[in-house]
Amino acid sequence: MNIGNDTGDGVGEGGGDEVGIGDGTRAVRAGLPEPVKNEPTLPGPVFAAHFHLPGEPTGPYTYGRDENPTWTHLERAIAELEAPGEPRGAETVVFASGMAAISAVLLSHAKAGDVVVLPDDGYQALPLLREQLEAYGVEVRTAPTAGDAQLALLDGARLLWLETPSNPGLDVCDVRRLADAAHAAGALVAVDNTLATPLGQRPLELGADFSVASGTKGLTGHGDLLLGYVTCRDAELAARVRRWRKIVGAIPGPMEAWLAHRSLATLQLRAARQSANALALAEALAARPEVSGLRHPGLPGDPAHQTASAQMRSYGCVVSFTLPDRAHAERFLAALRLVDDATSFGGVRSTAERRGRWGGDAVAEGFIRFSAGAEDTPDLVADVLRGLDEAARG
């Protein structure tokens, strides 16, 4: 159900547009079909390996690896959230996971001899894709997210990949500036929008060609399904991504797609509470002497704040900081009562982890990535401060 173009400016305030459509209204109605008497508002999942197809094969639904009506509803919904004002009609392609979505963009648009520019401080699995690209004969260049450092590597590039805010360091780059420079150099631009979600940042409006995300995290927000998606500026780009999905079979199950669509209805409510919780937590952590390296784009003193405030509509649910050493960090995590020691982020239940336990990220042993959930703010902040007090006692 297309419900108009949005020019609102805040998840927290439920930003709207010229016809009065706010983020919450859009999220609740996104992707719904026109009402049909005696049918549910959101049709249930369609489980089908093949579809009845007499005669010539016409229409989108032929075989379950190609298309599914449950995907269609979800894809339309995400496109409405990612690019409500896109005049040419953005298209979304959903995948079995975020890594499947990332791989689809990179591997469908880069071939031997091409140049791809990646961040060197992005998601932990991105180096695996770098290795695969290089094995295929693609030249990969890397630079940090901060300071728009990737600008210096665009000569001859085929594709520029941005991750902003970066995970787990929370650096931010100027998407519009980088996109303009990349397009001038003849490169396509993809932005990993996982941390911001479509309500916090709209990469296509900032000039990107692709907005890519793991829907496992903030988009669906319950920590109970894996999903990825790519929203493309136009049909031609989407066709290449969709073809790659068909080739490798990286499709979401109908149940996962349906659960994801159902979860979108609460996206604005979840995002607003979680973003507010993250900022309150960051402000409380700023007063703690044992905390160093505190990062959250919403803090006025954060190095990324000025850039983030110019392109983000809210600042996300993640806070990162460093405690004195590994033992101190582990004591802190063990002392928390309202926060699960778990990886990933974006869920309604707060999680935190010592990120260095995985290896691969250039972080200190005491580095904590904290994902603020939807708990009452005073309860969450009190639990974290109590945990810090216990950890400090040794």
Question: Where are each of the predicted segments found?
Answer:
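Conserved small-domain helix->loop->beta segment predominantly found in fold-type I
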Residues: 279-337, 354-363
